A protein has these predicted regions:
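Glycine/Thr-rich phosphate-binding loops of Rossmann-like dinucleotide-binding domains
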Residues: 1, 150-152, 187-189
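Glycine-rich flavin
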Residues: 5-12, 16-173, 206-210, 214-227, ...
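Rossmann-like NAD(P)H-binding beta-loop-alpha module
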Residues: 171-207, 211-212
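N-terminal start and proteolytic maturation junction detector
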Residues: 235, 243-245
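Leucine-biased recognition of intrinsically disordered, low-complexity hydrophobic segments
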Residues: 242-243, 252
Length: 255
């Protein structure tokens, strides 16, 4: 969007295509890309919810007497408010593109098989069964971002697993959760779920946060063992390609 608006500011006629292919669980969202819809924004809102929960538990140290039985976490309320905030941002981005004289098309663009280098075709959302519409251009910028992948060679993963594309839109709480992987997105999601009161197990192939400073990641690991395991969560590590994780009252997961 930044490139589209900048090009329009310099006098170019600009069309911006945005299309979200639903996740394996059917999750889809509006204009704004990963950060706004399934990344930074919802993650920070849910992290904030987790921090507030911890603050309530510690409030009595600062003179606030909040009874434990009165502290009830409502997942549906959090998800509803998160969605509403994201929709507000989606609307704001649409207005911003219009103000910048950028034509926004909610559709899937592609290059035809026999391409002259200056033609693409697109199908608008909700009109996928209609013939593609051709569009000529002088220059094209491809900036589609990335999506999380579910390994298709793991039986049941595609049908039952969710990703960060889904966690912020779940209509019911995730309950006991196995987080497979130990990158920063995995630990962020596992962290706010744990602090919101859910039992979380993180399955680690080798080390946490590969590529990050080891002193910092070792400290994070120590804190996870200290705080997560005390609340019913766990950290399971393995060196190799096959992992067996047995979660109490849950299922045996082969990885």
């Amino acid at each position: 969007m930044a490139c589209a608006k900048e090009a329009a500011r310099h006098g170019a006629r600009v069309v911006l295509f945005d299309y979200v292919k639903p996740s394996t669980q059917g999750t889809k969202w509006g204009l704004g890309g990963t950060c706004v819809n399934v990344g930074c924004v919802p993650k920070k809102l849910m992290h904030r919810a987790a921090v507030i929960g911890q603050t309530l538990h510690d409030a009595h140290h600062f003179g606030w007497n909040v009874a434990e039985e009165d502290m009830k976490f409502d997942w549906n309320q959090l998800v509803t408010n998160t969605r509403n905030h994201i929709r507000m941002l989606n609307f704001g981005y649409k207005k911003g593109l219009k103000s910048a004289s950028v034509t926004y098309i909610n559709g899937l663009a592609s290059f035809p098989e026999h391409n002259d280098g200056h033609t693409l075709q697109y199908v608008k959302r909700f009109k996928e069964k209609e013939p593609p519409v051709p569009l000529t251009f002088d220059k094209v910028l491809i900036a589609v971002g990335g999506r999380p992948a579910i390994p298709s060679n793991v039986p049941g993963a595609v049908e039952h697993a969710i990703t960060s594309d889904d966690i912020f839109y779940l209509n019911q709480s995730p309950g006991r959760t196995l987080v497979v992987g130990a990158g920063y997105i995995a630990l962020e999601c596992g962290g706010f779920l744990n602090e919101c009161g859910f039992d979380v197990t993180v399955a680690v192939r080798s080390i946490l946060l590969r590529g990050f400073d080891r002193d910092c990641t070792n400290k994070i690991y120590e804190d996870m063992v200290r705080w997560w395991c005390g609340g019913g969560a766990g950290v399971v590590g393995v060196v190799g390609v096959l992992l067996f994780v047995c979660v109490d009252m849950g299922k045996l997961v082969n990885w």
